[in-house]
């Protein structure tokens, strides 16, 4: 486990994947009190407030001119993985509503990715743009077609 935290590029690639393809495309909460959003919008107590991590992960205003590009390097500063603020990168939500399984999911993703990378060569067959299928959690419409070959680990 301790070794996983030193795999900076792996963490950057996982976060970049979830920036573009978050596991939950949109979510909503109910306002506990009357409030005013930073842009001046009044939110009445009990109102549903919906946010869209899928759209936020692609916003040029938030991520820059290359917001639609898969670019793990955007997470690396001074050679190390640096996490963004929860409200810029809302995949795990933030504040008191932060996902309880966040750390466990990151360890699981890194572990599975390492096992797959070590044991298999994976090539995407069709490099067309992935399309989300509507639903509570993220699925790709039509799936992702890939060729998987076992690596020769005897070398």
Swiss-Prot record:
This protein's UniProt keywords: Heme, Iron, Metal-binding, Monooxygenase, Oxidoreductase
Q: What is its EC number?
A: 1.14.-.-
Q: What class does this enzyme belong to in the EC scheme? A: oxidoreductase
Q: What induces it?
A: Down-regulated in response to mixed metal ion contamination (cadmium, copper, lead and zinc), but not in response to zinc ion contamination.
One Pfam family hit = p450
In terms of Gene3D superfamilies, this protein maps to: Cytochrome P450
This entry's Gene Ontology molecular function terms read: heme binding; iron ion binding; monooxygenase activity; oxidoreductase activity, acting on paired donors, with incorporation or reduction of molecular oxygen
Cofactor requirement? heme
Where does the record locate the signal sequence feature?
none
Q: Which residues bind heme?
A: 99
Q: Tell me the superkingdom of the source.
A: Eukaryota
Q: What family does the entry list?
A: Belongs to the cytochrome P450 family.
- What is the name attached to this protein's record? Cytochrome P450
Biological source species: Helianthus annuus
| Lineage of origin | Eukaryota, Viridiplantae, Streptophyta, Embryophyta, Tracheophyta
């Amino acid at each position: 486990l301790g070794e996983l935290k030193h795999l900076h590029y792996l963490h950057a690639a996982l976060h970049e994947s979830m920036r573009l393809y978050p596991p939950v495309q949109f979510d909503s909460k109910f306002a506990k009190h009357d409030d005013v959003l930073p842009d001046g919008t009044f939110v009445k107590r009990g109102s549903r407030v919906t946010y869209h991590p899928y759209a936020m992960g692609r916003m040029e205003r938030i991520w820059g001119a290359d917001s639609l590009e898969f670019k793990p390097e955007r997470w690396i500063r001074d050679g190390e993985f640096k996490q963004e603020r929860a409200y810029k990168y809302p995949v795990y939500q933030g504040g008191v509503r932060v996902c309880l399984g966040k750390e466990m999911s990151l360890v699981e993703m890194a572990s599975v990715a390492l096992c797959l990378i070590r044991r298999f060569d994976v090539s995407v067959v069709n490099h067309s743009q992935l399309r989300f299928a509507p639903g509570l959690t993220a699925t790709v419409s039509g799936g992702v077609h890939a060729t998987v070959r076992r690596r020769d680990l005897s070398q």
